[in-house]
Amino acid sequence: LRTLAQVRGVPGRLEPFGGHRAPWVVVDAAHTPQALTRVLVDLRTHARGRLICVFGCAGDRDAGHRPQMGAVAERLADQVLLTDDNPRREAGEAIIAQILSGMRQPARAVIEPRRGLAIRRAIATAGRDDLVLVAGRGHATRQDRGDHQVHFSDRAQVQQALAERRGAHFLEVAA
């Protein structure tokens, strides 16, 4: 991952953040069962600790993928945090329920509909050797909610959460 961090790739595609006293965090646009499988299998080879997956599924899109995505994440990640993606005109809770329906042990999934908080939680609770995948939105910078769009960037949220974590760590060390 250190080498990957030095390469300028496509924003939102296996894009690494963190490292150096913080967990590695990877943002990827994986939004199908096949893409999520591929990225989790690839990242597993780099995870020295837990592999944590934060994702949701888009609204008004292929609902049949949702249970499959839940099954993939449960099988390949050590911890799963389910959240909103782009709910569009669908209820986020209904989308998450469909994802959970594909899991054998849905009670083990952490549910935080507010995507920014889900990202922060995953990064705040990850150990230095853990690897966090934030999947589904990649480089997107807006979220569709009903009839309106709001600015939202996984990449910016990850950077902010890592900065907050570094600040909290600095305060703990300085105290």
Regions found by a protein language model. Give the residues of each.
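ATP-dependent carboxylate-amine ligase
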Residues: R2-A175
